[in-house]
Amino acid sequence: MVSSTNSSYDDELKTNTCKSMSARKKVSTPSKTSYPYYILACVVMLCVGLGITYFFLQNNVASAQEYPVKGFDVSHHQGDIQWQSISPQEFKFVYLKATEGGDFKDRKFQDNWLKAREQGFLVGAYHFYRLCRDGQIQAQNFIETVPKKTDSLPPVIDLEYDSTCINTYTREQLLKEIQVMHDQLYQHYGLQPIFYTSKAFYNIVLVDEFKKTPLWIREYQGQPELKGNPKWTFWQHTSQGQIKGIPTLVDLNVFQGSEQDWISFLERQGLYQLPQNLPIK
């Protein structure tokens, strides 16, 4: 998920470069015949780095494929989506960016909301939380934007580090403001909100808090492992997904559990009997 100003988050593996070799002590100038060895060493290091990256990516994909219930999330960054080209049988849930901070509204939200629902998708909305804005204002922005529908997924609050809002609140103050928004959305929509977050943000800010709030974890290097080992509900395993009908790369997600677990989750939200794309019980 992304803010209105920042590009999408990608974890990148740092690889060594040839520059470190040239920075070593220059006791003597190597002869021309030694240069091919430096080039060869650089090539070997590059191949090793690419191999490690490929290993992590392949294992991450294989791990995500263990979960049968798949979905994706989008915002205006994905442009004009051809919803009729995407199967609600293949992707069981979709989350749309609705709002950010106290006043930003995603310009594609209403269009995506209407068209995705028309195609039979189970749809929910998320809010990108600004750490330097108070929870009440942000909750109001979301409530004014996202319709209250009995067949929509629970609201999501996207919690991650924000370089424009450093040291505005202490951890205790921040948790208090997050609690305000959480409670406002719970009261308005009648559904327990979900927290989308990174491993780093959870381990530093959210650990041991909001224990009844479902977690949606962004982790691109393997299955999420959080401090205290809380159970996660959704896992965003890549931001480099490709779906026919979406003109850009897209975030892909899975639900933790089987098809039957998914049905149970939907039943708890009062959603099971409504959409036509649900699995047969």
Question: Positions of the model-derived regions?
Answer:
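Functionally critical loop-and-helix segments that line ligand-binding/catalytic clefts
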Residues: 2-6, 10, 16-18, 22-24, ...
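N-terminal Sec-pathway targeting helices
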Residues: 26-47
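Hydrophobic alpha-helical membrane-insertion segments, chiefly the h-region
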Residues: 46-55
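Substrate-binding cleft of extracellular glycoside hydrolase catalytic domains
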Residues: 59, 64-81, 97-180, 186-191
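Sec/Tat-exported extracytoplasmic proteins
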Residues: 90, 98, 117-120, 146-150, ...
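Glycine-rich, charge-decorated loop segments at or immediately adjacent to ligand/cofactor-binding or catalytic sites
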Residues: 135, 201-208
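Aromatic-lined carbohydrate-recognition surfaces of secreted/lumenal glycan-active proteins
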Residues: 190-203
